[in-house]
Amino acid sequence: RKIAGICRSIKPKYEYTVEVYSIVVPSGVRDIMREGDALSHCVGKSDRYWERIEQQEAYILFLRKTAEIDKPYYTLEVEPNGTIRQKRTYFDRQNDDLKDAEQFLKEWQKVVSERLTESDREKAEKSKVLRLQEFEQLRQDDIRIHTGDLAGQRLVDVLVSDLMETAA
C-alpha cells in the first residue's frame, strides 16, 4: 500500500513520453514484480528495492519504447533527482540498444530536474550519501556477482559503470 501511494505521488514528476521512448512509473508492487519476472532480473525478488522505495531513497521506473508502452524493455532504479543508479533488461543485461536511449535519458533527467521541489533535492542528497556508503561497503567486502554475464565482476564496479548522474 505504501509503495502504491508513493508511485501515485511521483507519477506527475517522473513520467515522460516522446515519440520513441517513455518513462513509465509503475502502479505498485505488482507492476514491479511483473516487470522483474518478464525481464528475468532481480528487481522483483529483493527486499532492498522495496525498502528504498518506502524510504524514498530510490524509485523503480520503466523505460519503454513508446510504440510498445506495455512491453517491458529496461528497468531503471532512480534517485529522487533523476540520477539513474541502474538500467537493466533481460537477465540483468545492458544491450547495445541502450546506447540509442541514452540521449533520451539525459533529456528526461533535465525535464525531471525542472520539476523537483526542495524536498526532492533533500531526498536526493540523502540518497547520494547512502549510495556512496553502500559502494564503499561493497568495495571493502569485495562482493562479486555470481551468475549471468557479469559473473566474477565486483558488484561495485558494475554499479559505478551503470551510474548516470544528473547534471542538476
Please report, for each region that a protein language model flagged, where it lies by residue.
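Catalytic-core elements of nucleic-acid end-processing and repair enzymes
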Residues: 1-168
